[in-house]
A protein has these predicted regions:
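N-terminal, charged low-complexity regulatory/assembly segments
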Residues: 2, 9-114
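Non-catalytic accessory segments flanking enzymatic or RNA/DNA-binding domains
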Residues: 2, 11-50, 165-185, 189-204, ...
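Hydrophobic transmembrane signal anchors and adjacent membrane-proximal interface regions, especially
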Residues: 5-8, 12, 18-21, 52, ...
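Hydrophobic, aromatic-lined core segments that form the binding pocket/scaffold
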Residues: 73-242
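Cys/His-clustered metal-coordination modules, chiefly Zn-binding fingers
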Residues: 213-278
Length: 278
């Protein structure tokens, strides 16, 4: 390049790439997109319905959306109404348990993928979700830098963001239903540990001993009862339907459906802990 012809901050090099500050910004944006798409690919390869997409930074990311374009609280009511109509025989506790589980499953499994496969934590507190015909699937995240660090740092930050996300969902569902923290916290603890115990099956590089050591840290980070560790089975014990890796401490009430039965990790089947419905 001849002296005096160096490109200025708004000029481009011969291959069309912006130079200077503009180039750095574009590179950072590309890295953000690439980072999230790698996370989304890992999540979808594990669970096809755990399918993510991005929204622009600063853009509103509704907590719950449906094709009807209803407000999130109305979508939450529709979710509860679906299970009430589909299984009237199962009763109010089942409808609420099923609805809450639907609202929270994606954030839990995405957190596992993010920490153990992607070694980062996205903006879980600003996660949006899609709803259709009783099922919550598909999610959105804002284009923001992910948190990096050692696994103990990632668990702590993931827990903080999950708590914020769940609080928003609690508010949404609670607008139409009688919902108490004492009802949802045991369900969250069960769902979290039931997902964590499967991580070594999902990702071969993570050992059973590692997730066993991490279990109390996940519960503490998420503000959930440590008493649920009573359902965790040691890594050396056999694992099958008769001896699952984690035994729930609160029954999900699936057996109350006309087509239902006791789950393999049900406390009723295992003779463990509580099946309270309140």
């Amino acid at each position: 390049m001849r002296p005096g012809t160096e490109p200025g901050p708004l000029q481009r090099s011969g291959d069309g790439r912006a130079l200077g500050p503009a180039s750095a910004k574009e590179d950072a944006e590309r890295a953000l997109f690439s980072d999230h798409h790698a996370l989304f690919a890992a999540a979808a390869s594990l669970i096809p319905s755990l399918k993510g997409s991005l929204v622009a930074a600063g853009e509103a990311c509704p907590a719950l959306t449906a094709a009807t374009r209803a407000a999130p609280a109305e979508v939450a009511k529709a979710l509860h109404g679906h299970w009430q109509q589909a299984h009237p025989e199962a009763g109010p506790a089942y409808w609420l348990t099923r609805s809450w589980g639907m609202l929270c499953w994606q954030s839990i499994y995405l957190a596992m993928v993010a920490v153990y496969r992607h070694q980062a934590v996205p903006a879980l507190d600003r996660m949006g979700q899609g709803y259709q015909a009783g099922l919550v699937s598909g999610f959105t995240l804002p284009v923001e830098p992910m948190i990096r660090g050692e696994v103990d740092v990632l668990i702590k930050r993931a827990g903080e963001r999950l708590q914020a996300h769940w609080q928003g969902l609690f508010t949404l569902l609670g607008e139409g239903q009688r919902l108490r923290p004492g009802f949802v916290r045991p369900l969250l603890a069960d769902d979290l540990l039931a997902a964590l115990v499967r991580v070594p099956d999902f990702f071969g590089e993570v050992s059973r001993d590692e997730v066993t050591a991490h279990a109390p840290h996940w519960l503490a980070a998420c503000g959930l009862p440590l008493a649920h560790l009573a359902g965790w089975r040691e890594g050396g014990l056999p694992r099958d339907e008769a001896f699952p890796g984690y035994v729930r401490q609160r029954c999900c009430l699936h057996y109350k459906r006309r087509d239902g039965e006791l789950c393999g990790n049900c406390p009723r089947r295992q003779g463990r802990a509580s099946c309270d419905e309140t």
